[in-house]
């Protein structure tokens, strides 16, 4: 059973589910706990199903990379056919439950997010262009917007602008990881930003992107009148990102860069929690 759980990438999708929750709680006039639970279930299934497809389509790449060689498909713990059927069933269930529980507009963003990650990022661009992350990053927007339109009943500019906090985080996070494992990506022939430019350019660009991401979070929270309690979460989120990014920018060492990567997920989580407290 554990290999099938691993296929869902729970350590990755929890932030996307939290983004949906934050979008819903921020946008909804009144939080309905049954609706919130439905949103979480749909988020786990749709994001997890997309992640499982990623395992299927990248099994050859995973086998070549030290970071991913122990995943279920390269190790033969799950057959390709079983993994494909599992990914299809989980994804379909997520979409059907979204349509039944959340409605057409949230389901549109569920489908767009799934399509962005599975088709645009994984199948189309992952092996072709370093722009893969930028094009597939809409999956982050879609996660937030699924919850937002579910709570508000419509799409508006505040929701769109807030969704880009997740979008900006995605390339900064993934490129930081790819920098750490850049030799893995080169060996597998995957063109990530950190493998197609020199190391100095990669360090400077990714560090500055992290800084921009943190400042954008702060800007959003001030712009949309966050609850004062939320600043208890936003301040360390921004401060942590600025500190680790500046450290990586100055030291330009693998260790400093890894600390920046490790800080990025908690920083986004703190920002999303601040929105929940709005």
UniProtKB/Swiss-Prot annotation:
One of its GO terms (molecular function) is protoheme IX farnesyltransferase activity. PROSITE patterns: UBIA (PS00943). Its EC number is 2.5.1.141. This is Protoheme IX farnesyltransferase 2. It is a multi-pass membrane protein. It is found in: Cell membrane. It catalyses: heme b + (2E,6E)-farnesyl diphosphate + H2O = Fe(II)-heme o + diphosphate. The keyword Transferase applies. It is an enzyme of class 2 (transferase). It comes from Pyrobaculum calidifontis (strain DSM 21063 / JCM 11548 / VA1). Keywords: Cell membrane, Heme biosynthesis, Membrane, Transferase, Transmembrane, Transmembrane helix. Pfam families: UbiA (PF01040). The gene is ctaB2. Gene3D superfamilies: UbiA prenyltransferase (1.10.357.140). Pathway: Porphyrin-containing compound metabolism; heme O biosynthesis; heme O from protoheme: step 1/1. It comes from the Archaea. GO terms for cellular component: plasma membrane. HAMAP family: CyoE_CtaB (MF_00154). Converts heme B (protoheme IX) to heme O by substitution of the vinyl group on carbon 2 of heme B porphyrin ring with a hydroxyethyl farnesyl side group. The keyword Cell membrane applies. Carbon 2 of the heme B porphyrin ring is defined according to the Fischer nomenclature. The chain crosses the membrane at residues 4-24, 35-57, 73-93, 95-115, 130-150, 157-177, 204-224, 230-250, 257-277. Its main location: membrane. Belongs to the UbiA prenyltransferase family. Protoheme IX farnesyltransferase subfamily. InterPro entries: Protohaem_IX_farnesylTrfase, UbiA_prenyltransferase, UbiA_prenylTrfase_CS, UbiA_sf. GO terms for biological process: heme O biosynthetic process.
